[in-house]
Regions:
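Active-site environment of divalent metal-dependent phosphoester hydrolases
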Residues: 10-13, 51-53, 81-91, 111-113, ...
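Metal-dependent catalytic neighborhoods of phosphoester/phosphodiester hydrolases
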Residues: 16, 49-68, 82-101, 107, ...
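Accessory, non-catalytic peripheral segments of nucleic-acid enzymes
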Residues: 37, 42, 251-382
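Conserved beta-sheet core of the metallophosphoesterase superfamily
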Residues: 180, 185-255
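Active-site neighborhood of phospho(di)ester-bond hydrolases with catalytic His/Asp-centered motifs
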Residues: 6-7, 43-48, 77-84, 104-109, ...
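N-terminal active-site segment of His-dependent metallophosphoesterases
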Residues: 1-68, 75, 365-368, 372, ...
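Active-site neighborhood of divalent metal-dependent phosphoester/pyrophosphate hydrolases
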Residues: 40-58, 77-89, 171, 177-195
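Conserved catalytic scaffold of divalent metal-dependent phosphoesterases
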Residues: 93-197
């Protein structure tokens, strides 16, 4: 059996007020080519199909067109689950009708995980789609107040699946979670705080393959058969070194054989350029990829006049500027001792913070409001 595993499309994503729909469409066109070439036995999309719970019209049309071509024209079975960015009920609209075309969209968790059974020349393979489920929602679903962490949720689901799974059949688990040790990036929405979102990879040991979603870097998660495919595109500058693409998985009669990461090429890459502004602008004349999304890390010692405007003259899709010298100076200034900070008035500290973030001072009315709030909080704490 041949499987293509992908995840974290985040259709409709907007980056610094720039729509990425055309970039996402370009990546999906490449994915279509890979599917047409390989004609896999299944396509897995492991959550975060959309970037928002209420997706844009353009994002919905993009997904619809993809499903029509792959599930309709190519007749390749699709198995899709919701992630933490998705609205399960919205994603699974018309899912009962789509199942007739072997397009399986599982947006809402249920007490019993129903397998999707596909076959190859060696027999049946059981696919277990597990949409994202928070501990709070799981406590309600299972009527169990002792479910406190994501580990508790997944352990409950996996245990039940293993109990019911035919022992002589191959199995694939599809899930959207964070496995301990995975490499994270800035663009992944935190599932919870305090480490309660962490899952141990050893609970997946009895499956032949685990198709993971959530982390944006393609990587193994504790075992070779437990993998993140990574996101469709780079969605933050913390991902500039990622090699985006899809994961192709091969099974034989005994189960998992291999996985292969197949890169996809974006129309506009995401890069960081570093140097003084003058150096960056001079080097830009030789740059053949000036349409890329750019963050400039400037090493200038002196202040600059309209650096973003000047940068955009050469890099029209420049998104960020980071002043490295200023950052280093700020880091030195933050060494003020905790004792010294305690001596300062909280209202004045907030005023300094506000001016730093908003580049303007608090007006008289705002000063009074902050002072009133601080006084109330101080009275409560005393």
């Amino acid at each position: 059996m041949r499987i293509i595993h992908t995840a974290d499309w985040h259709l409709g994503r907007i980056l610094h007020n720039v729509s990425l729909l055309e970039d996402q469409q370009h990546m999906l066109e490449q994915l279509k080519v890979e599917i047409e070439r390989d004609l896999p036995d299944a396509l897995i999309i492991a959550g975060d199909i959309y970037d928002k719970a209420i997706p844009s019209e353009g994002a919905v049309r993009l997904l619809e067109g993809f499903i029509n071509h792959v599930g309709g024209n190519l007749a390749v079975p699709i198995i899709m689950i919701s992630g933490n960015h998705d609205s399960g009920p919205r994603l699974s609209f018309a899912s009962t009708l789509l199942e007739k075309a072997k397009v399986h969209i599982i947006g809402k968790a249920s007490v019993e995980v129903q397998p999707i059974i596909l076959s190859d020349e060696h027999g049946e393979v059981y696919f277990y789609p597990v949409p994202y489920l928070s501990p709070i929602a799981a406590r309600s679903l299972y009527q169990d107040s002792e479910i406190l962490t994501h580990q508790d949720v997944i352990q409950r689901q996996v245990t039940r699946i293993i109990e019911q799974h035919p022992k002589d059949k191959r199995s694939v688990l599809i899930i959207h979670e964070f496995v301990i040790g995975g490499e994270i990036s800035d663009s992944e929405r935190q599932l919870s705080v305090g480490g309660t979102s962490h899952i141990e990879a050893n609970i997946f040991s009895q499956f032949d393959y685990v198709a993971m979603g959530h982390l944006h870097q393609a990587q193994r998660a504790g075992y070779d058969h437990v993998r993140y495919s990574g996101s469709l595109l780079k969605y933050s500058f913390s991902e500039v070194k990622h090699n985006k693409g899809i994961t192709k998985v091969t099974f034989d009669e005994n189960g998992f054989v291999s996985s292969l990461h197949t890169p996809l090429k974006p129309t506009r890459d995401m890069r960081i350029v570093k140097g003084t502004l003058t150096e960056i602008l001079e080097q830009a004349h030789l740059d053949t990829q000036r349409e890329d999304f750019i963050r400039a890390e400037l090493e200038d010692k002196e202040g600059l006049h309209e650096p973003m405007r000047r940068l955009k003259e050469m890099y029209p899709n420049a998104l960020e500027i980071k002043h490295l010298r200023k950052t280093n100076q700020n880091a030195a200034q933050t060494e003020t001792s905790f004792q010294e900070l305690q001596k300062q008035d909280i209202s004045e500290l907030f005023a300094e913070f506000y001016q730093h973030i908003c580049a303007e001072k608090l007006n008289e009315e705002q000063h009074k409001l902050v002072a009133d709030v601080v006084e109330q909080l101080t009275n409560v704490s005393n």
